[in-house]
Amino acid sequence: MTMIFDKGNVEDFDKELWDAIHAEEERQEHHIELIASENMVSKAVMAAQGSVLTNKYAEGYPGNRYYGGTECVDIVETLAIERAKKLFGAAFANVQAHSGSQANAAAYMALIEAGDTVLGMDLAAGGHLTHGSPVNFSGKTYHFVGYSVDADTEMLNYEAILEQAKAVQPKLIVAGASAYSRSIDFEKFRAIADHVGAYLMVDMAHIAGLVAAGVHPSPVHYAHIVTSTTHKTLRGPRGGLILTNDEALAKKINSAVFPGLQGGPLEHVIAAKAVAFKEALDPAFKDYAQAIIDNTAAMAAVFAQDDRFRLISGGTDNHVFLVDVTKVIANGKLAQNLLDEVNITLNKNAIPFETLSPFKTSGIRIGCAAITSRGMGVKESQTIAHLIIKALVNHDQETILEEVRQEVRQLTDAFPLYKK
């Protein structure tokens, strides 16, 4: 009898699948990645995620499992928990959430009941699907009311949010965004929540790495619960994380994750989270996070100086910014597709007070975490901005687009990802 262990590696056993994986490896190696929610993990993170831990079921929590043989995964998960607590200065951490959306769902379950009113950032203003979109579980389960940004500054107006909170009397206020380029004042959000007797939950998925490094204000001592992903700027595996300083809420969070939403945790992913947390605890990670901010500011400044483009809110304080491209190309979708052709990857994105369809949009979203992971700096960030502009302005000139492709290849060859 031939055992499955005799099948060899993926390349030998499943050529069709391997070809797709290899093609993706080549794409990542030779494309400039500017999707703000993506990053490049270390080989150590990938090794942990591909370990034998994938074989082990471990329903429950360390020291209190429903299965035997969990003494090793208890060590793994405890390492992840303790490192997360240290990294963010939190008293309690749940590392089992499979994703940021699962983390948000668990936080809602811990804090409020179905039908309760929640004040969250409107998707069109930079919020996330799980902040109350009507097509998402959050909007279907709870009564979300959206707050927006100021029409003139395109930034959060905390006085207006306070007045809105007074009017709707939410049980929960959600702060955090997926497409907001400015620093968020969590202290002001907590004051608003306290004023109306609401809980404050912060979704820091996009900025977690910046928070961990101390280059962005932390929400941990202001929010009742903080949720996050472990990828994006934190540069770990795809997964979720929940933090709190309240012991009673920690118990509710744990119950909401298991058995409320999930069964067995993904211990191989939790191991990869533990590796990423250790990487982020290294002093060098602060330099990396600051470089993300510096690179993003440098790239955004190039667009700000070109009157054919409009930089949303006029600048950026973090890893991301939005650009209105409609003076040079019809919509963001066309811009995204065109840039794909020259091996620059980013996404179309609605801008505040959007007038186009969400499937087209007026803007594009640009993030610099992934290029910073490759070692690119301010000079390269400025070059990339000029390449984007060159491609968009000359979107019907194939000769010029080919020039951009060649310049992109020169950059990626100079800053290899895994082929070092």
UniProtKB/Swiss-Prot annotation:
Q: Which reaction does it catalyse?
A: (6R)-5,10-methylene-5,6,7,8-tetrahydrofolate + glycine + H2O = (6S)-5,6,7,8-tetrahydrofolate + L-serine
Q: Where is this site: Plays an important role in substrate specificity?
A: 231
Entries under CDD domains matching the protein = SHMT (cd00378)
Per the record, the domain of life is Bacteria
Q: Which cofactor does it need?
A: pyridoxal 5'-phosphate
Going by the UniProt record, its keywords in alphabetical order are: Amino-acid biosynthesis, Cytoplasm, One-carbon metabolism, Pyridoxal phosphate, Transferase
Pathway(s) annotated for this protein in UniProt: One-carbon metabolism; tetrahydrofolate interconversion; Amino-acid biosynthesis; glycine biosynthesis; glycine from L-serine: step 1/1
The function of this protein is: Catalyzes the reversible interconversion of serine and glycine with tetrahydrofolate (THF) serving as the one-carbon carrier. This reaction serves as the major source of one-carbon groups required for the biosynthesis of purines, thymidylate, methionine, and other important biomolecules. Also exhibits THF-independent aldolase activity toward beta-hydroxyamino acids, producing glycine and aldehydes, via a retro-aldol mechanism.
Q: Which family does it belong to?
A: Belongs to the SHMT family.
Q: What HAMAP family does the record tag this protein with?
A: SHMT (MF_00051)
Name it. Serine hydroxymethyltransferase
Lineage, broadest ranks: Bacteria, Bacillati, Bacillota, Bacilli, Lactobacillales
| Primary gene name | glyA
